[in-house]
């Protein structure tokens, strides 16, 4: 072969792209526009001779299996290519090998009919493990961080609270350095302490009013037994501080004088069912403290500070004693605290006549020809 010319019959002998030697075989393979020996045309990955079919990418040649493994659809779990002849599992847009289609927690391979959850990173979690993880997460979120304060630290904080219930920042920094507690812990302790003081004052006021109304009930000779019992709320421990981003209810409630409380609707001017257009008559009794929720500290209408103060208040003085409107059967009586312009309460006339009315409210009396003749009878000196 050394003396054999490079041209045979006027044609140039091709060179093999694999070994760079002249191809003198009977059969010549051609791929990627180049000539190959049959033994030189191999897969770039497994080096298997490519006799029947080959796949190319760039300057490399591959067999069918290696080509799809490298450039075909990849498994979402192992990121390896999946041959087109292999059975796969699908979850939405993700494709998995059969052995890769398993729960990442318990490693159990998921079969047809099993319930699972698909995470954002294409991982699979079986239903049992997912619900268990969710429950643990909820329990961990519900537990707020708590700090236990020693007796010495508690004594220092109480002493500072007695001096100033709302200390400045530099005072809190000093307390933090003295007690060794975090600034946030000191701040939360003072917030909880102030809320507790407000709650205790509010509960004490409720007990005083409740006792007063029970005494009034007994004084009137009520036959029903009083089953109301005052439950003392358990006192929070000052040695435990819990963190929360929400303001305390004591600071948001009506105790700060900004907002009125929401309670049962007052029946003073309500319309009872079955009697449309009429208003109930009130016979005596003292207004409870909840009816003064709309008053401001600067209001001329004073709110009694204690039940004992109500006993010393003088009774209402009637402003209009004989002015009646027979055509509507309505009378006007004063109903309000003394010391200011009393509001007027409208009383229904569809029933017994009022004690303050001089005429009959059950019928229509004969009116004089001129309204001035009966309007002059009203004593205007009272105004």
UniProtKB/Swiss-Prot annotation:
Renumbered residue ranges of the record's region Disordered: 197-383
Biological classification of the source: Eukaryota, Metazoa, Chordata, Craniata, Vertebrata
Domain annotation LIM zinc-binding: ranges: 14-73, 73-136
Organism this protein belongs to: Sus scrofa
Role: Transcription factor. Recognizes and binds to the consensus sequence motif 5'-AATTAATTA-3' in the regulatory elements of target genes, such as glycoprotein hormones alpha chain CGA and visual system homeobox CHX10, positively modulating transcription; transcription can be co-activated by LDB2. Synergistically enhances transcription from the prolactin promoter in cooperation with POU1F1/Pit-1. Required for the establishment of the specialized cells of the pituitary gland and the nervous system. Involved in the development of interneurons and motor neurons in cooperation with LDB1 and ISL1.
Record SUPFAM superfamilies: Glucocorticoid receptor-like (DNA-binding domain) (SSF57716), Homeodomain-like (SSF46689)
Annotated Pfam families: Homeodomain, LIM
Localization, UniProt: Nucleus
DNA-binding span(s): 142-201
Post-translational modification Phosphoserine, affected residues: 56, 223
InterPro entries: HD (IPR001356), Homeobox_CS (IPR017970), Homeodomain-like_sf (IPR009057), Lhx3/4-like_LIM2 (IPR049594), Lhx3_LIM1 (IPR049593), LIM_Homeobox_TF (IPR050453), Znf_LIM (IPR001781)
Protein name (database record): LIM/homeobox protein Lhx3
Low complexity bias (residue ranges): 307-334
Single GO term (MF): RNA polymerase II transcription regulatory region sequence-specific DNA binding
A cellular component annotation (GO) from this entry: nucleus
Ranges annotated as biased composition (Pro residues): 335-344
Residue positions, PTM Phosphothreonine: 48
Keywords, ordered alphabetically: Activator, DNA-binding, Homeobox, LIM domain, Metal-binding, Nucleus, Phosphoprotein, Repeat, Transcription, Transcription regulation, Zinc
Entry domain remark: The LIM domain specifically interacts with the Pit-1 POU domain and is required for synergistic interactions with Pit-1, but not for basal transcriptional activation events.
Subunit structure, as described in the record: Interacts with POU1F1. At neuronal promoters, interacts with LDB1, in motor neurons LDB1 is displaced by ISL1 and a ternary complex is formed in which ISL1 contacts both LHX3 and LDB1; allosteric structural changes in the DNA binding domain of LHX3, induced by the ISL1-LHX3 interaction, may explain differences in sequence specificity of the different complexes. Interacts with LDB2. May interact with CITED2/MRG1.
């Amino acid at each position: 072969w050394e003396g054999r010319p490079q041209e045979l019959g006027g044609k140039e002998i091709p060179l093999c792209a694999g070994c760079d030697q002249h191809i003198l075989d009977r059969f010549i393979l051609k791929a990627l526009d180049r000539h190959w020996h049959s033994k030189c045309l191999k897969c770039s990955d497994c080096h298997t001779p490519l006799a029947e079919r080959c796949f190319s990418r760039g300057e490399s040649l591959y067999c069918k299996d290696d080509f799809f493994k490298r450039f075909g659809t990849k498994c979402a779990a192992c990121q390896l290519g999946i041959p087109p002849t292999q059975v796969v599992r699908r979850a939405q847009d993700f494709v998995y090998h059969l052995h890769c289609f398993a729960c990442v927690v318990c490693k159990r391979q998921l079969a047809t009919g099993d319930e699972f959850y698909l995470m954002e990173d294409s991982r699979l979690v079986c239903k049992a493990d997912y619900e268990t993880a969710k429950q643990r997460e909820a329990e961990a979120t519900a537990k707020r961080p708590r700090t236990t304060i020693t007796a010495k630290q508690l004594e220092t904080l109480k002493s500072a609270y007695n001096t100033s219930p709302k200390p400045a920042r530099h005072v809190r920094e000093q307390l933090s350095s003295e007690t060794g507690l975090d600034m946030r812990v000191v701040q939360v302790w003072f917030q909880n302490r102030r809320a507790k003081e407000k709650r205790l004052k509010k509960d004490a006021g409720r007990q005083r009013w409740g006792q007063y109304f029970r005494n009034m009930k007994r004084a009137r000779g009520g036959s029903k037994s009083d089953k109301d019992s005052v439950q003392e709320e358990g006192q929070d421990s000052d040695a435990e501080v819990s963190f929360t981003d929400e303001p305390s209810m004591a600071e948001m409630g009506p105790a700060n004088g900004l907002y009125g409380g929401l309670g049962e609707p007052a029946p003073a001017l309500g319309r009872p069912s079955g009697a449309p257009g009429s208003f109930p008559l009130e016979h005596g009794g003292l207004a409870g403290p909840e009816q003064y929720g709309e008053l401001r500290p600067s209001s001329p209408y004073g709110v009694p500070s204690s039940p004992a103060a109500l006993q010393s208040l003088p009774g209402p003085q009637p402003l209009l004693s004989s002015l009646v409107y027979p055509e509507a059967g309505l009378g006007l009586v004063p109903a309000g605290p003394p010391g200011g312009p009393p509001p007027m309460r409208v009383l229904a006339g569809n029933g017994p006549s009022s004690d303050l009315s001089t005429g009959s409210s059950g019928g229509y009396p004969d009116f004089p020809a001129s309204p001035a003749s009966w309007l002059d009878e009203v004593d205007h000196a009272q105004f």
